[in-house]
Amino acid sequence: MTYRTDQPREHFSTGLIVGRFHPPHLGHSWFINAAAEQCDALVVFVNTRAGELVPGSLRAGWLAELHANVTVVEVAHELDTNWNDNELWAKWIALFRSKWPHNTGPHAVFSSD
């Protein structure tokens, strides 16, 4: 979906953004704010792995402080990102479902890449 300020936007019950936010920057904040305007409840998953220069807990904390109107969840994992591997993809989905804080949804996934 292309974000245009002159067009009406669809509204969703819940939305999801997934990223590393390593480190969080103004572009991330703009994106989170734009998505939050389109959702009753926006969840931001901060993916993190052991050994990263900036720990995921710190990045998640920064985002939670900057965006008190959204739910920020640290998603620690050691999974690879070979999207052609169906078993690996199933592990990612199971991980994300285990971290999802609502009974339904997400009703929209927002992506910048």
Label every model-predicted segment:
Residues 1-113:
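Nucleotidyltransferase catalytic core that binds NTPs
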